């Protein structure tokens, strides 16, 4: 069951741009709720409450819709037979040493990435934290505004641009289009 719990951990990390590690591993069963759109009661949003983040005392990210509909129910039902309480951990509910767990899950991610030849890329390595970078990049490619991405990820727009999106060729092309767009060359 440890590997299924690891899968859940990796999926939660990628669901809302979390900082992988203790912010996610310390989520309790009471730290999530479903929000409903007042205009469309069928539109559900999964909101987490994270206490004591790196940058502020409380952060409330929301998960992507696919995760909310398809993956989160699996996570909630994974330990359904156990008598879990609201104060129990959402992920790995029976393991108490969260720092050791963070290291073990991170090592597993690296080992799997190396085995699949995904760990080394563009002259660097891709540890578990790269899931956060990928989250920002994918949202940006889909047209999300940098300010919105930063809000979701509990970071600054400057950090999103300089660290998470990186200076890839395509990002520079997109930046050029936004800045210089329809400028005409004067001959």
Give residue ranges: language-model regions.
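Basic, Lys/Arg- and aromatic-enriched nucleic-acid-binding interface segment
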Residues: 1-21
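The alpha-helix within a helix-turn-helix
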Residues: 13, 25, 150
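Conserved tyrosine-mediated DNA breakage-rejoining catalytic core shared by Y-recombinases
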Residues: 16, 25-73
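Key DNA-contact positions within bacterial/archaeal DNA-binding proteins
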Residues: 22, 103, 158
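C-terminal secondary-structure termini that scaffold catalytic or DNA-interacting sites
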Residues: 35-37, 95, 178-187
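Catalytic-site neighborhood detector that most strongly recognizes the C-terminal catalytic loop/helix
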Residues: 52-56, 153-178
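C-terminal catalytic core of Y-nucleophile DNA break-rejoin enzymes
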Residues: 52-77, 86-111
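Short, basic (Lys/Arg/His-rich) helix/loop patches that form interaction surfaces
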Residues: 81-89, 106-151, 158
């Amino acid at each position: 069951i440890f590997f299924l719990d690891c899968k859940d951990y990796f999926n939660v990390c990628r669901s809302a741009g979390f900082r992988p590690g203790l912010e996610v591993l310390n989520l309790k069963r009471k730290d999530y709720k479903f929000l409903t759109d007042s205009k469309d009661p069928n539109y559900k949003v999964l909101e987490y409450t994270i206490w004591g983040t790196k940058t502020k005392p409380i952060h409330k990210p929301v998960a992507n819709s696919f995760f909310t509909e398809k993956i989160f129910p699996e996570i909630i039902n994974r330990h359904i037979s156990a008598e879990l309480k609201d104060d129990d951990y959402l992920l790995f509910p029976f393991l108490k040493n969260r720092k050791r767990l963070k290291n073990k899950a991170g090592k597993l991610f690296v080992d799997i990435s190396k085995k699949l030849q995904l760990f080394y890329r563009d002259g660097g390595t891709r540890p578990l934290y790269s899931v956060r970078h990928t989250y920002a990049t994918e949202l940006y490619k889909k047209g999300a505004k940098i300010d919105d991405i930063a809000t979701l990820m509990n970071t600054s727009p400057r950090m999103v641009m300089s660290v998470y999106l990186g200076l890839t060729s395509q990002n520079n092309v997109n930046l050029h289009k936004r800045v210089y767009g329809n400028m005409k060359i004067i001959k």
